[in-house]
Swiss-Prot record:
Protein name: Immunoglobulin superfamily member 1
GO BP term, pick one: regulation of DNA-templated transcription
Domain of life: Eukaryota
Residues listed as glycosylation sites in the UniProt record: 43, 328, 371, 871, 967, 1063
Ranges where the Ig-like C2-type domain occurs: 21-112, 114-211, 216-302, 311-398, 400-481, 570-658, 659-753, 758-850, 854-938, 946-1041, 1046-1131, 1142-1223
Disulphide linkage map: 48-96, 238-286, 333-382, 422-465, 780-830, 876-923, 1068-1115, 1164-1207
Assembly information from the UniProt record: Interacts with INHA; the interaction is not confirmed by standard receptor binding assays. Interacts with ACVR1B; the interaction appears to be ligand-dependent as it is diminished by inhibin B and activin A. Interacts with ACVR2A, ACVR2B, ACVRL1 and BMPR1B. Interacts with HECTD1.
Amino acid sequence: MMLRTFTLLLLCIWLNPGMTSLAVESQPELWIESNYPQAPWENITLWCKSPSRVSSKFLLLKDNSQMTWIRPPYKTFQVSFFIGALTESNTGLYRCCYWKEKGWSKPSKILELEAPGQLPKPIFWIQAETPPLPGCNVNIFCHGWLQDLVFMLFKEGYTEPVDYQVPTGTMAIFSIDNLAPENEGVYICRTHIQMLPTLWSEPSNPLKLVVAGLYPKPTLTAHPGPILAPGESLSLRCQGPIYGMTFALMRLEDLKKSFYHKKPIKNEAYFYFQDLKIQDTGHYLCFYYDGSYRGSLLSDILKIWVTDTFPKTWLLVQPSPVIQMGQNVSLRCGGLMDGVGLALYKKGEEKPLQFLDASSNTGNNSFFLKNVTYRDAGIYSCHYYLTWKTSIKMATYNTVELMVVAWPSSVFKVGKTITLQCRVSHPVLEFSLEWEERTTFQKFSVDGDFLITDIEGQGTGTYSCSYRIEAHPNTWSHRSKPLKLVGPAGFLTWNSILNEAVRVSLTMQLASLLLLVVWIRWKCRRLRLREAWLLGTAQGVAMLFILMALLCCGLCNGALTEEIEIVMPTPKPELWAETNFPLAPWKNLTLWCRSPSGSTKEFVLLKDGTGWIATRPASEQVRAAFPLGALTHSHTGSYHCHSWEEMAVSEPSEALELVGTDILPKPVISASLPIRGQELQIRCKGWLEGLGFALYKKGEQEPVQQLGAVGREAFFTIQRMEDKDEGNYSCRTHTEMQPFKWSEPSEPLELVIKEMYPKPFFKTWASPVVTPGSRVTFNCSTSHEHMSFILYKDGNEIASSDLAWGNPGGSTAHFLIISVGIGDGGNYSCRYYDFSIWSEPSNPVELVVTEFYPKPTLLAQPGPVVLPGKNVTLRCQGIFQGMRFALLQEGTHTPLQFQSTSGTSADFLLHTVGAQDFGNYSCVYYETTMSNRGSSLSTPLMIWVTDTFPRPWLSAEPSSVVTMGQNVTLWCQGPVRGVGYILHKEGEATSMQLWGSTSNEGAFPIINISGASIGRYSCCYHPDWMSPIKIQPSNTLELIVTGLLPKPSLLVQPGPMVAPGENVTLQCQGELPDSTFVLLKEGTRQPLEQQRPSGYRADFWMPVVRDQDSGVYSCVYYLDSAPLVASNHSNSLEIWVTDKPPKPSLSAWPSTIFKLGKDITLQCRGPLPGVEFVLEHDGEEAPQQFSEDGDFVIDNLEGKGIGNYSCSYRLQAYPDIWSEPSDTLELVGAAGPVAQECTVGNIVRSTLIVVVVVALGIVLAVEWKKWPRLRTRGSETDGRDQTVVLEECNQEGEPGTTTNSPSSASQEVSVELTVPI
């Protein structure tokens, strides 16, 4: 008999929570049933049961050969194989299998039937549930094949059993708690029949129980490292302190398939992986054990990554990306990989600034910059840093920009920011900052901190501050001592200086090497052989260095090439003027600046030639006022304003030019590109409200067009652009009342018609009315090939796409806004061009960003139900004036109609409506001058095109069958909104009316039900407009009051659980004759059925029941003499209609995207109560988890949680009936975008550099080997060194000089000696 030994070191791992189980692999269960104790061997049946799923076929095997198989009439969990009387021919080894989707399952455990009169030998195995240390809990399982056996556990050395059990099934579990060394030993299990204590089974195979953890734990290391690419080699070394042990290595994700043993001579073992694969990623550990299976502690877990791309890293700056000079800042770098080194890089520098080794990378890794200066400002990123070679590609990474604020220094650099701090020793109400060089400059602050940015190099100057206190808010203090901001202006940085120095140095080195080669060739063109190596080496080295330098320059240029990120520019603000003309047009002039961006913090007003005028914070309307007072000659000039956001300054607004104290500001004229034969609008912006506009053409004295007061701007229209309309245009503004005051003419606008390509096709992939944060893609396409595209917003270029190589026969470009902001709205268009010819502008797309203003109300006039062929007007009622409105229909991408209005509402006419106009409509309003910031969408309004109102439905809540005194609400429900309802009661002349309902439901509450409330009700629509459309009444509702008669009884035939398609009869038995019976179902507001039988019982027949007929039923009855006054409810009766219960739904929370190391809760929900849920994972034979509430927590330990899941459930009252599995739910891993690490050009350059370096090394090695031999020859002939030879060579090269020295003779000899060689 073979002795089976189990080491708890392994078994405690196998079933550790969160790990993959090795012991259970979806094996079926096989057991015996017989008619013992009367005749235990005369009627034997073998049962085979599937562990987790139903099957259509089952197979019985005997002695490794097929004996028989059964196909049941329907899928089931278990089947029986009848054996009959046990004879010699029936003895043997039995196993069974069941049919899965792709073949037969694993066979069951072996059942051995021996000769009659002896029970089968039980199966004996062991499991542990905690880590393998003394004190863990162990379960010993004994499987006895028969029901209701007595199980005995014996231990070697003991005559009596150490434990026994009488379980109800076929298996006993013997538990050993707090495992101790005294529990070691050999165990066996035997069984016998309770009624026949003398009939014993054969002893099971023995188990040797060994307590692990008796030896110290080994160390596990990886060579060359724990992170490698697929296809590379890995060596794992497990080293312990004791020689002669057997070492074992395992991967926790798949213990059964990745379990390795080695018995080396030394105290260490190497486990080799020659060709790594992605699936080799996981957590590895090792241990060792002696010949008696006494094991060591487990090594520390070693995580091995096999990946072709590093996961993405991220970088976070603390405390802020904007840091004051001299302070400390930490850059925290993180990623999915731990135990790997990290390196901090700064843009513009090749070498890393700092390193973090692998031991310190534990998830909270920070690089520290102390006493930051301007040199530390820049863009930083972090990467994984490995100390071994690997071919893993670098993934994408985020960058952060560190800005250094030069406080408290007073040295001001152009483009930098300084914080001026005004401080006093007592509380103040407000601080004020003045700039002596700008008399109109003034800033205010509550905390005394003023940020000064040196825009346009004008930040230097002398500043002072003052304050006021709350007790005297109108009195300001004396000014502080002045502070002067000075310093060199410019943008030179150490980085740029170093770059230039490197370039100059490289150029000088190349020039020096070239000069050296020329000099050697000129001075030594007649050198003898023993010095020839110097010339060859110098030339070779010089040329190799030149080639390497050029390659390095090319590599740097290629490596520093960055992908251009298209960022939406900060929209420029709008500037205008307000005054109280015509009474005093220049006595009280105020300039206003407004930004279309909702994130604007401050506004700055500037004047050409003077600079900074003033700064004002943004109001709630995202605007600011700059009062100038009475207009004087000092105010004349050109003004513009900027808006400031968190880290950006907008473009300047259009310039407003004040030209005199009695002349209106000069307007600004603009127009789109003129296209032959098409309409052209010329825009004239006049800065002030209530002005008249005039358009002039050069060469004509009178205006070509004039417009009255239409706001601050006017649009002149040329209906059809022709050659005669070309020329220079200008516009002027004037006051509306005499005496007229005119502005200066605007700058001229030249209109020239050019030959153009046809306009492109321009659209958005989804609706142009979007919510903040949405993704918007613009598609610009043309039939012309190889075109470049430009995207415009409000006439300004914001993005381009060069040479969009599309499908044959056309070109296409896609412009993407990943997350729309409130300032991204506007009018978008596109154009395409080739080398010299441009296309016409596309039709504009108005992108409206909603949820900035309150939603409007949409109403239909005369009503939402319209006869075919009639007109209907949809009125969109907003809140603010001067908005633009858009009408949308559900199912269409683009708005149906647009309207601009000076009021607060817009009317959209649907003319001669037909069936295609039926549907839901909504509307939105938005600003046209402020990036199309829009309102939320209105509540949808359904428009019905029909000659008859749809029939409403009347129901009662909570039910139409209620007890006396209860409150009930009658709901008249219909699909038409904005219509009144009328409620009728049978036998009464008056009706209840509900006018102008704004929802699609009308509620009629009835308080404290009494006898007067009992009756039959109906309802109908009651439109508040005159309409020939027909009105239909609703269904009739009977309001029944219960509790006045004895309750009936309710029975079901044939039973409470039936298969779909069968017939069911519900029998309601009352106690009084001449009654009407009412059948009710829980959850429904209306009775299901009513009957008036001749006797005391009503039979409610339900033919061909379906799943939806499942539920809780009850019944009541009432007498014909007192209708609708009913009895108490019968007892509730629950009915299940199922062959298989309906499949559940499976969802994931918070999402199906699985981040490594994070948990996901899978929620399995079914329609039936009192069930038990089971979760299955594709690739695993056995169910993974069971739950009564349907919640399963999946931890993605080692990345094993990813895959396809499904769930099912079974009824606790009917445990053999399982539902269909749910739809498959896939959990996927979060993966960042993979970035291409280097270009093909850089790969080629890098290869050439390697070739050059190798060639350089070979040349130097060859010459170095020649040098000692040449030195020896030279010393034998003339005994002089290299220096003397060079000097003589120089002398020989001089004209008129002869040399007869022995050295020269020796040189000649040396030359002659080498010729034969």
